[in-house]
């Protein structure tokens, strides 16, 4: 059925939103490498195994090699795992090869002695469901993606905050994925230090020397050289080098080779003059001798006659040193070029600080810093240093780290190298010194180019690798201790360390979270969440403001709106609608390519660092029909700023206005009119909306509702084109046209619908079929709606008629006044399912028993239990009702002679047992909807178990018959065209004696084929070819039927075989109770714009304000909640919703009044004003059209996408079309008096949600209950059945009133005076109302605290002072 919807969006978005769960599902698929043929690429699980294997023993006499792995089929399906509390996992088997070598003791060469290959069971691996979740111990969990600092290189400075001189100190850090961190930093004296793994710092040149560089090599790499010439006449000339510009004052006249003056003495050498000097071929010119003093030698100066070193490289030049050169006949010397704007002597100064002469000593020094306890030998130190950065086993940059390092250092030679090369370290130091000398900008660590996402596949891969490394140690030890020649591979491999780590990660890791299953939206957003917390991430306390803030690089990647409000603000964020994560883990967003002002259809995805140089136009930039940008100047983003750019400069364009927000924010209509803080609350509160009994799509939507519903996994979607064979409330069977879809079932697929399924948050999740038998469906069409989904679109709340006005103070401070009609009609009623579990164990005193025979319990309490002591389905229960009767043996006491006699007469019946039955906890009142009984495999089954098993088997039998019937129908349809009208070559007999189904020579008709069993057609025709074709088709049919029977036989077997219960458990019973929660005073409700409030009063319908036509409003909100909050979107929604409702009702009235079909068509077209809708209307036949219009009875569904929605003028137009006031205000009348209110009131239709903060779940009362062990005061909180705390402020209030007796009562007998409590009870029973207070227990606690400080406190009663005698609480006069 075509749903007529009004689209207000003007921008045509060609690119569909990528599937919302792809992030999780694709990542785990890539990890498992599902469906790929061998040899597998070295990534995911394959790369983990390859990184650890082969494993050799210490003597290299044997080696264990990995061949391949296979993942088997899971033992239980998802539904069974949830019901039985199991993990949805599959077994993994690995094939390994053990090679044993003979080693020649002289040459140490190895020859293969023996090879053993074996398949080994390697534990299990949790599988991801198609919804992107994991089922761990029966609960659905989500692995949240982690946002982490990317491996690579980061350059930073301290902004002058570290040293007192306020000097800006630069530093750089090389971060690997695995291995030692390397930090370089300058101190205030410009000495460069290095830290390895944040240990004690040392001069950076020690590291360079350890790499094998000498002092001269270091100077040659970091510095250019200048050459000076010493003349015989005492002058110093500088050898002209065009690349080293000197902005000096000329010391003498500088002449060219033809004695033409280039620059006069005392004049400044400019760049123009420098170019003239270069052009003239000048070789050298005289310089001021004082400018040479203080420079540093580039090379050692050696006296050629004696071989003596006159001066070492890096030595500072002095006047004396120059005189020494002249005396020794040295005519030229080179110095380090340290005088430029971007060069300094810091590396030379560091070399002077560094007193270590050789590579060996440098390696030993590094070893001492990192391993202070053990003294090194040169060999150990060299091997240790080599392993630090050059060994794959200890150091891994990862492809991401290498990519970022190469990108930052602008060096792409070692694109595949995963370790750190010497060149990387040298280039990093070179860039760091350049940044320091030129005061260059530091990297922004909060830029998304420097933060990457670790997806679920990578997180599990890391855990698997850690487990394998632990296992590797154990294998090596086993190979060395035992005689390997006699062993098989399975003797060496124990997969337990891997299994333990996986179990810990999925069960307790900070990133493995209990799925938020409040509604379909909360499920999807939880899977798209990014967390900066978790192992290897930030902590709440340490994270500063910068890392939490919205960054310019977040645009189109991370939503600036959706984040929690508490201490996690900015640390937990959401992906935007179109964002994708690339292979390196960087978030990408799509853009359309723009060339010469023309927008092309080419789409590219860019990460944040690639986007920096682009000029990007917004999605709402005006374009003509040819795709050219209309405006000469357009608003663009470039280099982190918003600019006006000429259209020819634009290189890219956004693809959609909603690309910058997450799906939660994209569901808020008129988001552009809301303040960001309120939009944040709105997007967060939609995730808390409770699925209602009958949900309703919003009249004012954004178009995102359908995407969320389809991708959430809560709906059932058609996987191809086909026809519905069977549909009821529990099951839909579809026959697909594509023969490749489910070929084993003959293209027929059965979908079982969820009914009364308990979600993680205890809500009732169910699916409703939205198709009928015989209906033709297209691929992607919705077959069944899920929870909070209606007609294939998200439906979290209800459309209510709202009035913004004060009403007797009942909407003070965001309170909400609501009509009783809403409660009466179950508009906001939701169903919650509570699960209760009880186990009968084998105790030391004997087994516990689930029974109806419970001591000291009256028959009335047992009335709803069956003969086995288990509650019957359908029973209405309230607090303290028994759900399952259970007795537990008590400890045997010394028996009296009478008890011994009773025991002798009645046997075991008289033994001591206590009642440990499962009872309904306080605050729960509902109906039992399901009971599951789990028995030990070998244990006896009671009648209830057998009854449940019989019911489940009968259910499976009927499902099997339905399935077979649908496949048979499909096969008959395939055969009919071949045999229609063909004559039978034989008589077909029925089962009964002499029963004839079809005579020989009779022609086949569709009716006859329907009445014949398919088997009877085999060889029944005269044509041999036809018989062969039919035989072949029937053999396929037989295979399909047998396959289905095998599946259902296996399911029936599982029902009757018993269960795997934990050790010591005999029987387990689970009871599900459905609780109906109607809207009540105290429930929290909210709109989509952050406008939230609590229901303060439910008013009778007749007292509510009403319109002139007598229809009352549903809800009254406070108008003061709008201006200060600045969420004007709610007013726009209210007005548009009113117009949509009125227009829908008017069109429906026209149908009911029998208006001519043609004029009705024209009217509908004029309302929608859309060529696409007009074409759809013209294509419909009259009946379909009428039905489509009648569906608009409750209102026209409108789509107003974020940042591209309906403007004010369009809302006014729609109000005018509906015949409503253009300002959206109406005269309302007081329901109590019938008089009109003084002013006109803003009214309309708003979408209101009921949130998961229900008063019934929060409120509780206590008379007596549990007390704290130490203080003897009542516990706190509903979960502990605690009481109210009377704190300091309450005591002050009572003191201020002088209510001393009341205060004494509160602080003693009503709280923690144990003996006083008992006495008070006794006195109340006797009718003596006299308060006799003793010492409160908390006073004793205080005394003990003081004693623990060494102060002995004793209490004395003073002599002669007697206690005052009183006869009652009030002295009698």
Swiss-Prot record:
Q: What is its EC number?
A: 2.7.7.6
Q: Please list the GO terms describing molecular function.
A: DNA binding; DNA-directed RNA polymerase activity; ribonucleoside binding
Q: Superkingdom, according to UniProt? A: Bacteria
InterPro entries assigned: DNA-dir_RNA_pol_bsu_ext_1_sf, DNA-dir_RNA_pol_bsu_external_1, DNA-dir_RNA_pol_su2, DNA-dir_RNAP_su2_dom, DNA-dir_RNAP_su2_hyb_sf, RNA_pol_bsu_bac, RNA_pol_bsu_CS, RNA_pol_bsu_protrusion
Catalytic activity field = RNA(n) + a ribonucleoside 5'-triphosphate = RNA(n+1) + diphosphate
Which is one Gene Ontology cellular component term of this protein?
A: DNA-directed RNA polymerase complex
PROSITE patterns with a match to the protein in the record? RNA_POL_BETA (PS01166)
The UniProt entry's GO biological process terms, in alphabetical order, are: DNA-templated transcription
Q: Which residues form a coiled coil?
A: none
Q: Which PANTHER family match?
A: DNA-DIRECTED RNA POLYMERASE I SUBUNIT 2
Quote the subunit structure annotation. Answer: The RNAP catalytic core consists of 2 alpha, 1 beta, 1 beta' and 1 omega subunit. When a sigma factor is associated with the core the holoenzyme is formed, which can initiate transcription.
Instruction: Name the chain's protein.
Output: DNA-directed RNA polymerase subunit beta
Phylogenetic lineage: Bacteria, Pseudomonadati, Thermodesulfobacteriota, Desulfovibrionia, Desulfovibrionales
- Tell me the gene name: rpoB
